[in-house]
């Protein structure tokens, strides 16, 4: 054969049907169907030999479509579940949904015409809310499945199912019997816009809230015995000065609180005297715009039990002590309304003050507020109180004050604190046990422990009652005559059994007689049933009892709870409180939290900014597919693995493009590996470790390092380490180094040559371990790779094959070997820089048109390098040769650096005390392998071939 190109057919080019493109929109659903039909999740969750691993799902709210935060959350959970499944553990994941509560009720009401609303009964509203919730669950479920998330999708837990509601009533009952549930008139967060009490978890604190703050004086009417001696000369012109950001609470004022440890000053103003904190005098002079000369000072403690006159009502109130009073703002004296504040309530109880809350459920003043009755407290009520104080000369100053103020998380309207009859869980009763339980849990990241500890330490009792219809009823009856609640083991167990059978609708459907146990029917008393439902945080907070304790093969406590960092205040806490109150332990062993998803500039996502990333559009593509290409689920999942989820994480179009590029690199690497294994069967063709060339042993050492790091990334839940390591392995170790060098062995050798089979052995190990290692994160790609393995395998799915398998013998190679290849890689970099200059200057085209000259100063090292540079004809099956490592046709080791001086300086390089250079290769180009050789043209039969290729052709 003497025609150029005649040897094309003799080269072993890659062969695989594995697609270069993911075509995710079509291929991912096919792979999901394959998993479903073969019941991969079901089989492994039951048949894996290891211990169970139970990650308990925090239920998303069945209200609307999924957003990118849902995707981040569910994908993180799935990565962890799939990893432990590959590790052989029995992973059972039961997804859940939170189905009750005001937001769903509001959605249903918003979708109705006014005449439909007017005709609503509690039961018809509940039916509509249930239908809405179930439709939403179905829609969200399909989206979650499309993300590639595995779980018990045919049997999820829903907080509206009878068995769940019954278990929840059981938790409530246990807390009642332990004395932790009580009814009381207490200030609670009340939403006038929703007309219900709210838990702290249902509040948000938007930026930019401004209140009307006022400084007010109350005239002192009597002094305590301890204050008399110091202050009697200043009466009757002595007043206390208070500051408040809620003028509407002044009608509820019953006391003024001081800090017993602060010093207070009497200052002169306009011919009368004000009592204020001594260290705030200067600041108040600036605020009020007047000089306030100090007349005398007195200890806060000495003022206890002095009295003052309310400026707007005919009543007097005491000065009381509160260590929560600070000098951060205001006057150092705090207006106290026990019906409108938590600290006010506590101090009021201590001093035996009544609870006055002259505000109704609509947020309007009641008759108790006298002249203000009927006014909306947050609007005209505020204004009217300020005007009234002005008229009686009690207003010292009004100014705008920007601060964090609670809003209803659903209606986005401000809330108020208002005393109402509510049901509470007494956190005080088990706070210490809860704090001890927190300390037993592993928190990831660690600062989560401090957050939830502070919250539980400081939290007030939990208001668990809601004045709405769509929820689980508080199973209480009230005596018609006395109003006394009837709530005991017998009544709770009876209602629980009914709910287990008929669902919580029974509370509205059945008569009082049917809901009461036999002993309480016809006993001479008349009862009415309560109308309150439970806080939805009590619903989801009971999931450990309704799911973990009830279902076979689940475990309580769970291995892990995983949600957004806002759940320290929400689900983590409500679950902890119910579990500790009833069992004395936390319901979880580990709690992992993630941040929120922001845009690429670090801003919150909002429709108004146009920066919302919709996971459905990321996966399926948008209307304009150029603008919003269909990336598929794996690229979304790859993004999840790339971020440090312990704080807020960015996402946008540029980041998605980067992810697609990285995904493509991993996919193309896998495709190259598959293509070059088309004629390899490990059962027959693999080469044993001790026969492998040095390069291959070095590569196996790198494989051990890489996959050990990947494993540590998964066990420590630091998935960004996985992302960086796998990306680096595919690009730097494989594509740019090993596979670059391997092409010559793979394509040019005879199919069954040792140098080719040894390389394929490494490719096989790299490919299978790569597929297994990426399976938790990009399961569709991993499965796709596995389905295209060109040799028989006993495992029909990558997930059945288990986790990466690394042989201990690969881990301890000769240190000399490692040092040599670290040097080779550094030297390659230097050589490539010079080759690029030759290319730019059109001296050469491909690197095989070049020859490398090396001068090694150290004689010992020179001998080592000489061993890697045999004469051309000596190593027909060579692998460990410098020319292959550098992808050049020849390498010459020089005896003196002087021989480099003839080269242009730009074609020379230094490394350490050695040096080298690059110049065009000797000889002619071989038509088969494209290496240059002085042998080309010397073989009569194969004039166009080099000595290596002639040897292959003559076999």
From Swiss-Prot:
Q: Per its Swiss-Prot or TrEMBL entry, what cofactor is needed?
A: Zn(2+)
Which biological process annotations from GO are given for this protein?
A: isoleucyl-tRNA aminoacylation
What one GO molecular function would you report for this record?
A: aminoacyl-tRNA deacylase activity
Q: Which reactions are catalysed by this chain?
A: tRNA(Ile) + L-isoleucine + ATP = L-isoleucyl-tRNA(Ile) + AMP + diphosphate
Q: What is known of its domains?
A: IleRS has two distinct active sites: one for aminoacylation and one for editing. The misactivated valine is translocated from the active site to the editing site, which sterically excludes the correctly activated isoleucine. The single editing site contains two valyl binding pockets, one specific for each substrate (Val-AMP or Val-tRNA(Ile)).
Cofactor comment: Binds 1 zinc ion per subunit.
Q: Which domain of life does this protein belong to?
A: Bacteria
Q: What class of enzyme is it?
A: ligase
Q: What is this protein called?
A: Isoleucine--tRNA ligase
Q: Mind telling me which InterPro entries this protein's record contains?
A: aa-tRNA-synth_I_CS, aa-tRNA-synth_Ia, Anticodon_Ile_BEm, Ile-tRNA-ligase, Ile-tRNA-ligase_type1, Ile-tRNA_ligase, M/V/L/I-tRNA-synth_anticd-bd, Rossmann-like_a/b/a_fold
Name the job this protein performs. Catalyzes the attachment of isoleucine to tRNA(Ile). As IleRS can inadvertently accommodate and process structurally similar amino acids such as valine, to avoid such errors it has two additional distinct tRNA(Ile)-dependent editing activities. One activity is designated as 'pretransfer' editing and involves the hydrolysis of activated Val-AMP. The other activity is designated 'posttransfer' editing and involves deacylation of mischarged Val-tRNA(Ile).
The UniProt record gives the binding positions of L-isoleucyl-5'-AMP as 563
Identify the EC number(s).
6.1.1.5
Subunit-level organization: Monomer.
Tell me the Pfam families matching this sequence.
Anticodon_1, tRNA-synt_1, zf-FPG_IleRS
> Which amino acid positions bind Zn(2+), per UniProt?
926, 929, 946, 949
Q: Which Gene3D superfamilies match?
A: 1.10.730.20, HUPs (3.40.50.620), Ile-tRNA synthetase CP2 domain-like (1.10.10.830), Valyl/Leucyl/Isoleucyl-tRNA synthetase, editing domain (3.90.740.10)
Q: Which residues are involved in binding ATP?
A: 607
Name of the gene: ileS
Query: Which keywords annotate this record?
Result: Aminoacyl-tRNA synthetase, ATP-binding, Cytoplasm, Ligase, Metal-binding, Nucleotide-binding, Protein biosynthesis, Zinc
User: Cross-referenced PROSITE patterns, in alphabetical order?
Assistant: AA_TRNA_LIGASE_I
Query: Motif 'KMSKS' region located where?
Result: 604-608
Residue span of motif 'HIGH' region: 60-70
Q: Where in the cell is it found?
A: Cytoplasm
What cystine pairs are annotated? none
Gene Ontology cellular component annotations, sorted alphabetically: cytoplasm
């Amino acid at each position: 054969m003497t025609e150029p190109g005649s040897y094309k057919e003799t080269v072993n080019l890659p062969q695989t049907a594995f697609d270069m493109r993911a075509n995710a929109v079509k291929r991912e659903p096919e792979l999901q169907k394959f998993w479903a039909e073969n019941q991969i999740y079901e089989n492994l969750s039951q048949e894996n030999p290891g211990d169970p691993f139970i990650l308990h799902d925090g239920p998303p709210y069945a209200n609307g479509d999924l957003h990118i935060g849902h995707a981040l959350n569910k994908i993180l959970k799935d990565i962890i579940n799939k990893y432990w499944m590959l590790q052989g553990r029995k992973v059972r994941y039961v997804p859940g949904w939170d189905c009750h509560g005001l937001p769903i009720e509001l959605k249903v009401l918003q979708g109705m015409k006014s005449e439909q609303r007017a005709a609503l009964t509690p039961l018809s509203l509940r039916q509509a809310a249930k239908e809405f919730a179930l439709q939403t669950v179905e829609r969200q479920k399909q989206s979650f499945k499309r993300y590639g998330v595995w779980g018990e999708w045919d049997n999820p837990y829903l907080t509206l199912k009878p068995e769940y509601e019954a278990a929840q009533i059981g938790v409530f009952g246990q807390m009642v019997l332990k004395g932790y549930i009580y009814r009381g008139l207490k200030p609670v967060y009340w939403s006038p816009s929703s007309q219900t009490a709210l838990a702290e978890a249902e509040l948000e604190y938007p930026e930019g809230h401004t209140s009307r703050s006022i400084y007010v004086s109350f005239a002192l009417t009597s002094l305590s015995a301890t204050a008399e001696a110091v202050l009697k000369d200043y009466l009757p012109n002595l007043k206390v000065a208070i500051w408040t950001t809620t003028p509407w609470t002044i009608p509820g004022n019953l006391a003024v609180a001081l800090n017993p440890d602060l010093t207070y000053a009497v200052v002169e103003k306009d011919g009368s005297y004000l009592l204020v904190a001594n260290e705030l005098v200067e600041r108040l002079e600036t605020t009020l715009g007047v000089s306030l000369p100090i007349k005398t000072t007195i200890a806060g403690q000495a003022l206890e039990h002095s009295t003052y006159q309310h400026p707007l009502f005919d009543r007097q109130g005491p000065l009381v002590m509160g260590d929560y009073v600070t000098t951060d703002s205001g006057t150092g004296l705090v207006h106290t309304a026990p019906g409108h504040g938590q600290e006010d309530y506590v101090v009021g109880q201590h001093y035996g003050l009544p609870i006055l809350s002259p505000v109704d459920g609509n947020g309007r003043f009641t008759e108790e507020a006298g002249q203000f009755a009927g006014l909306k407290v947050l609007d005209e009520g505020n204004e009217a109180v300020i005007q009234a104080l002005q008229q009686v000369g009690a207003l010292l100053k009004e100014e705008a004050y920007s601060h964090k103020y609670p809003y209803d998380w659903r209606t986005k309207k401000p809330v108020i604190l208002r005393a109402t009859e509510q049901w509470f869980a007494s956190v005080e009763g088990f706070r210490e046990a809860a704090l001890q339980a927190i300390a037993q849990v592993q928190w990831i990241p660690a600062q989560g422990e401090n957050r939830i500890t502070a919250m539980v330490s400081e939290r007030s009792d939990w208001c668990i009652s809601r004045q709405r219809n769509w929820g689980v009823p508080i199973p209480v009856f009230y005596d018609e005559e006395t109003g006394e609640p009837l709530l005991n083991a017998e009544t709770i167990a009876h209602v629980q059994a009914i709910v287990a059978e008929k669902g919580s609708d029974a509370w509205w459907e059945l008569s009082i007689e049917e809901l009461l146990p036999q002993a309480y029917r016809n006993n001479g008393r008349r009862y009415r049933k309560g109308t309150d439902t439970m806080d939805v945080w009590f619903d989801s907070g009971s999931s450990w009892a309704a799911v973990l304790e009830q279902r076979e093969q689940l475990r309580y406590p769970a291995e892990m709870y995983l949600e957004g960092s806002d759940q320290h205040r929400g689900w983590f806490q409500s679950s902890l409180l119910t579990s500790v109150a009833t069992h004395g332990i936390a319901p979880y062993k580990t709690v992992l939290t993630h941040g929120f998803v922001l845009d690429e500039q670090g801003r919150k996502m909002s429709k108004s900014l146009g920066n919302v990333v919709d996971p459905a559009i990321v996966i399926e593509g948008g209307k304009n597919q150029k603008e919003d290409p269909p990336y598929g689920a794996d690229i979304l999942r790859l993004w999840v693995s790339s971020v440090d989820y312990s704080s807020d994480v960015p996402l946008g179009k540029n980041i998605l493009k980067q992810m697609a590029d990285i995904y493509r690199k991993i996919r193309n690497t896998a495709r190259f590996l598959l293509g070059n294994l088309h004629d390899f069967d490990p059962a027959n063709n693999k080469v044993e470790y001790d026969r492998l060339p040095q390069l291959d042993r070095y590569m196996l050492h790198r494989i051990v390092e890489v996959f050990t790091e990947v494993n540590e990334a998964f066990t420590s839940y630091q998935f960004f380490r996985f992302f960086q390591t796998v990306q680096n392995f595919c690009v730097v170790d494989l594509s740019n180094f090993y596979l670059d060098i391997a092409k010559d062995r793979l394509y040019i050798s005879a199919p069954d040559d040792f140098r080719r089979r040894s390389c394929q052995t490494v490719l096989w190990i790299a490919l299978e371990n790569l597929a297994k290692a990426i399976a938790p994160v990009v399961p569709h790609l991993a499965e796709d790779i596995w389905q295209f393995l060109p040799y028989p395998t006993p495992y029909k799915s990558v997930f059945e094959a288990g986790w990466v398998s690394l042989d201990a013998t690969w881990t301890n190679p000769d240190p000399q070997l490692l040092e040599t290849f670290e040097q080779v890689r550094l030297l390659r970099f230097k050589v490539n820089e010079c080759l690029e200059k030759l290319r730019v200057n059109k001296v050469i085209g491909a690197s095989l048109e070049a020859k490398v000259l090396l001068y090694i100063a150290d004689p010992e090292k020179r001998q080592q390098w000489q061993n890697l540079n045999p004469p051309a004809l000596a190593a027909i099956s060579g692998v460990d040769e410098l020319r292959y490592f550098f992808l050049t046709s020849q390498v010459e080791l020089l005896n003196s650096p002087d021989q480099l001086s003839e080269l242009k300086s730009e074609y020379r390089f230094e490394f350490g005390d050695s040096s080298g250079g690059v110049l065009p290769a000797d000889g002619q180009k071989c038509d088969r392998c494209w290496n240059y050789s002085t042998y080309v043209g010397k073989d009569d039969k194969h004039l166009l071939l080099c000595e290596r290729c002639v040897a292959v052709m003559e076999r």
